[in-house]
Amino acid sequence: MSLCTLAINLSAIKNNYFLLQDICKTSLVGAVVKADGYGLGAVQISKALIEENCRHFFVASSEEGVNVRKALGIDVNILVLNGVFEHDALELIEYNLIPILNNLKQIEIWQQFGNLKNLLLPCYLHFNTGINRLGLSSNEIEQLINNRDLLKGLNLQYIISHLAISEEIDNPYNLEQLNKFKAYLRYFPSIKASLANSGGIFLGQDYHFDLVRPGAALYGLNPLMQNPVTLKAPIIHLQNLTLDSHIGYNMTFTTKRDSVIATLPLGYADGYSRNFSNQGKVFINGRSVPIVGRVSMDLINIDVTDLPPSDIFLGQEVEIIGNHCTPDKIASIIGTIGYEVLTSLGNRYRRKYTR
């Protein structure tokens, strides 16, 4: 078992959910739990949020959806963002998963399996309004508008779209997407709608519609939200090095003074990026400590020379992620985003869920 502890505060995630509910008073608030709840545990997070009456959970694939369904039971909606494919349609039906249909081919597949089972199968439609990843194209949407038989035999519950740059509040592309979405919805007046992701929630009520879909904000990846994640590692080795000593693979760091170097039991195999080599920071009792040398597969070295001797001992806990170094803060060091930091954490850590 790993010597490092990844602690996930479910109460903090719940508090973030409450705040989002307060912002979106006229809308339902779902939860995006894809990628194993952004690396933090989809099942544990979903169970916590269902206690607060969350009833819409978004996953990427049927496999993720089955995992959540088995944990939660039948009294929730589980939405599959990648839609349906011929190889997993029966699994979606068996586990009552709702696909978000992204093109005419997926609509056709879902209709065919509905006819096969003599069922009116539930679905959402995804209209592409400008992110240009998934979603029905403007040409496909026009076909649906002009030929409603293309949706015959389906229980269409929601129409959704996805914002491309919602974290930039003043970017005009947000309004462009909103207006395009509203224009499409005029042709489907009886169908509920969903547009806002985490960033979209903070763009204002015009973006909320009937259901919002926060992911990042639930997990503290927003300045207004509470960070629920703490990753700590113990010092497992200490050494005193003289001036001009080399540290780690390829000798990328050379001491400029007599130094005290501590070794921690985590590395890139644990999702701690090699890009933190010689530029990452960790914290001991609130004081910043630099990473020196290469991040290796299972180990990193830190320079603790400037700490008081009372803080330097075998077993001392070192904060890798926490309130001093949130996922967003450490992501900025290596030019990535907090999402990547969380989803890269892997399964080697000892996990602890608190409330």
From Swiss-Prot:
Write out the residues that bind substrate: R133, M297
Pfam families per UniProt: Ala_racemase_C, Ala_racemase_N
Q: What class of enzyme is it?
A: isomerase
Task: Give the EC number.
Answer: 5.1.1.1
- Give the UniProt entry's GO cellular component terms: cytosol
Gene3D superfamilies recorded = Alanine racemase (3.20.20.10), Lyase, Ornithine Decarboxylase, Chain A, domain 1 (2.40.37.10)
Catalytic activity line of the entry:
L-alanine = D-alanine
Give the required cofactors. Answer: pyridoxal 5'-phosphate
Q: Which UniProt keywords apply?
A: Isomerase, Pyridoxal phosphate
Active site at K34, Y249
| Residue list for modification N6-(pyridoxal phosphate)lysine | K34
Task: Please give the superkingdom of this protein's source.
Answer: Bacteria
* Pathway this chain belongs to: Amino-acid biosynthesis; D-alanine biosynthesis; D-alanine from L-alanine: step 1/1
Supply one GO molecular-function term. Answer: pyridoxal phosphate binding
Q: Which BP terms in the Gene Ontology apply to this protein?
A: D-alanine biosynthetic process
Does Isomerase count among this protein's keywords? Answer: yes
SS bond partners: none
Q: Which NCBIfam families match?
A: alr (TIGR00492), PRK00053.2-3 (NF000792)
Q: Which family does it belong to?
A: Belongs to the alanine racemase family.
Q: What does this protein do?
A: Catalyzes the interconversion of L-alanine and D-alanine. May also act on other amino acids.
Q: Which HAMAP family match?
A: Ala_racemase
Q: What is this protein called?
A: Alanine racemase
Q: Which organism is it from?
A: Rickettsia canadensis (strain McKiel)
